[in-house]
Amino acid sequence: ACVELIKAMGLPHEGAILCDSKGVIYNGREAGMNQWKSAHAVDTDARSLADAMVGADVFFGLSVADSVTQDMVASMADNPIIFAMANPDPEITPEDVKAVRQDAIMATGRSDYPNQVNNVLGFPYIFRGALDVRASTINDEMKIAAARALAELAREDVPDEVLAAYPGERLHYGRDYIIPVPFDP
């Protein structure tokens, strides 16, 4: 779903290399393939996650804990974006990323780290919008609108009542605050 959404937002087909438990999903691979994986297969010499991460701008992880190493992160392009969203433990921790990359933007699915990626940020509002317009399905345009609204909200000043819910944290747009916190109205 994530890759389909970013492709709907304009990422070219060849701009994403997907991996599963057997490695890179590439044109010509036979092991473990199905119609959904085949739809995202690309022409590449990369065969492993480590290969795919060399020079990558972005990593979206939705797999298992500790599947990304510091060496993989170090091999990425400048200013990499790393969304390690496996729960309860991410593919790589923010501490491990910061140890090798001070320029990285990092997000996880955990509330005890900055930039928590959590469906609580989108579901109530997407459903409210769908109900308001009597939509029978939630389409890409709705998902894109929600993503853009969250991005805009993260750039706004954080209200005092939200700051009070997060004592001691600096909540302002930057590497450690690209996603609003759940209590932001």
Predicted feature locations:
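Alpha-helical scaffold segments in soluble metabolic enzymes
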Residues: A1-A8, D51, G55-V58, D71, ...
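Rossmann-like adenosine-cofactor binding region
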Residues: K37-I105, R110-D112
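Ser/Thr-centered flexible coil motifs
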Residues: G32-N34, T69, N139, P159
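Intrinsic disorder and flexible coil segments
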Residues: G10-L11, G23, A50, G55-D57, ...
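Adenosine-phosphate binding glycine-rich loop
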Residues: A84-F183
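Surface-exposed beta-strand edges and their flanking turn/coil or helix-capping segments
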Residues: A31, A74, N119-G122
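Short glycine/serine/threonine-rich phosphate/pyrophosphate-binding segments
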Residues: A1-L5, Y26-G28, D66-D71, P90-T93, ...
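Glycine-rich phosphate/diphosphate-binding loop of Rossmann-like nucleotide-binding domains
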Residues: A1-V64
